[in-house]
Amino acid sequence: MKNAVHFGAGNIGRGFIGKLLADAEVEVTFADVDVPLVDQLSHKQEYKVKVVGTECKIDTVTHVTAVNSASEDVIDRIVKTDLVTTAVGPNVLDIIAKTIAKGIAKRFEAGNDAPLNIIACENMVRGTTHLKGEVYKHLDKSLHAKADELVGFVDSAVDRIVPPAEAANDDPLEVTVESFSEWIVDEQQFKGDIPNIAGMEKTNNLMAFVERKLFTLNTGHCITAYLGCLKGHRTIREAIEDPNIHAEVKQAMQESGEVLIRRYGFDHDMHNAYIEKILGRFANPYLVDEVDRVGRQPIRKLGANDRLVKPLLGTIEYGTENQTLLKGIAAALKYTNDTDPQAVELQTSLKEVGVTKTLAKYTGLAEDSDEVAQIETLYNQL
């Protein structure tokens, strides 16, 4: 395991995946469209990561470079690399798929028959499987069988809070991250040897961990943000230190947790400890994480497979308590942010067609369901 191409040189790319790879002595080439960022990374070939938990420490990440992801350079790197990773955001996966497909085709053309593994590290369920579908659309059909044999598309679950850099910091490459991190990969999807990277955990039951993170960290995070916005709090820490919000977020995570316990057999006490750990992470005094960063793109977050509605569907499936999850969805409908196109679209829909039709459109819940009626009642009370 010698080198990797990582798409996305943003905060998560540099502060999480890129750092773990570099710490494992992998030479990392970042690929990004941000020209000044690429220029600085390729010039300096190192950057600082401020790791904040009970104490602060600054690590220097070395042996890195960068190329423009819209250039031929990145395709040439894919020809020779051992690993491709991404942290670009779910919406950008479809855009980079064409580049990855070109890289795979050129790799085969060059006679490189070494296995290649690709891991999308995104906040989405089975993100790499989605990426594979997009890559294959751009890959000549005659190469599909060979790609099936030699290219592993490895799904993963990732968890680390990486807020935007503080504006006062004069080093544009420095990134702040929390000390907690979790990167879990599906060991059944690799081709060839599984790379040994400290901090990358292997499992044969990925969905349990994907949903544990989605239903706990992501569900709790966005409900903290939406309830915080309604109370006028600016940051996640301010919001979670509000006793009423703390109690409701904890209750929401316990409601979604009951689904996980029934579905995957998680231990009740251990899952409650996991919830407490996440509440502690939200209150990290060193992380300035604004509610608007966590609350943005509410339409995506209200999707049937995302952090609010998916756990709700689980409570319906198992017949368990869901009152606070319903309130979280109602709070999401109240989210306003003029700089976020999805928030604007959501508010426009509420004005034009009302709560019931808006919920049906974006969540997939039936207009005549009890849940939609309850959410509407809660919405009117907020």
Swiss-Prot record:
The EC number(s) this enzyme carries: 1.1.1.17
Catalyzed reactions: D-mannitol 1-phosphate + NAD(+) = beta-D-fructose 6-phosphate + NADH + H(+)
Region forming the signal peptide: none
PROSITE patterns: MANNITOL_DHGENASE
Binding site for NAD(+): 4-15
The entry's keywords: NAD, Oxidoreductase
InterPro entries in the cross-refs: 6-PGluconate_DH-like_C_sf (IPR008927), 6PGD_dom2 (IPR013328), Mannitol_1_phos_5_DH (IPR023028), Mannitol_DH (IPR000669), Mannitol_DH_C (IPR013118), Mannitol_DH_CS (IPR023027), Mannitol_DH_N (IPR013131), NAD(P)-bd_dom_sf (IPR036291)
GO CC entries: cytosol
Superkingdom assignment: Bacteria
Gene3D superfamilies xref list: N-(1-d-carboxylethyl)-l-norvaline Dehydrogenase, domain 2, NAD(P)-binding Rossmann-like Domain
GO molecular function: mannitol-1-phosphate 5-dehydrogenase activity
Pfam family, any one: Mannitol_dh_C
Record carries keyword Oxidoreductase: yes
Family matches, as PANTHER family: ALTRONATE OXIDOREDUCTASE-RELATED, MANNITOL-1-PHOSPHATE 5-DEHYDROGENASE
Cross-referenced HAMAP family: Mannitol_dehydrog (MF_00196)
Entry similarity comment: Belongs to the mannitol dehydrogenase family.
Record-given protein name: Mannitol-1-phosphate 5-dehydrogenase
Organism: Vibrio parahaemolyticus serotype O3:K6 (strain RIMD 2210633)
GN (gene name): mtlD
